[in-house]
Amino acid sequence: MKKITLLFLSLIFTNALALSPYIGSYQLYADTKMGNLQIGSAVLNLEMNGSEFTFTTEAKTESLWKALYDYSRSEKSTGNETDGQVINKYFSVIEKIKDEVRKDYEITIITDKNYALSSTGEEFEIKPGLLVDPLSVYLALSNDMLNNPNQSEFTYQVVDQDGVKYLKFIVEGQENVSINERDIETVRVTCEELELTLNLSVEDNFQPVRIHKVNGKTEFTMLLIEFMS
């Protein structure tokens, strides 16, 4: 696996969404009573087997900060790329704060029968159109922004533990993000329903450079520091 610095990030998504395996390493920050602190790390990992993809994230606080805020979250999304579209089959998430499991569920998507089945026993109807999850939406969004550079709004049918809903992503404009004393030109995209803000690299096919997420009373930021493909 060839190591590439942020300056030379290679192509992740083509216009046909030909997904390529990669690992993105991020620093994890949280707003605390002592200010915005680097408290841990996160990794995004895209694995490919032909047209089948497995996309995972792992975020956790370092041992030094566990007394202040002990947090971990892992997600997994699987599916395939068909005719330039991301088609989901499965999604899971485990989120812990201290010793308490806040989220732990799986969702199996049966596209040809238009429903999704949760590990809680609930069954959700899928409306016409493609379905993504809170993780694979990153893949779908990057591809759509490549193919529709002048579009300012993207809407997706997203499934999670609460069911299937439509989420709207708004392109707010360009914004420079400083990483290692270098300004990276990005496009800022927000999703009000998820309390999510993305900064996607203009030069590197809208690879997430910064991901800002509000979880309850805590705000987290993931900042890209290294990319491997």
Spell out what each predicted region is:
Residues 4-14:
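Sec-dependent N-terminal signal peptides
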Residues 122-127, 131-162, 171:
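Flexible, glycine-rich surface segments
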Residues 19-108, 148-229:
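Acidic, serine/threonine-rich low-complexity disordered tracts
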Residues 96-138:
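Hydrophobic, well-structured mid-protein blocks that either form specific transmembrane helices
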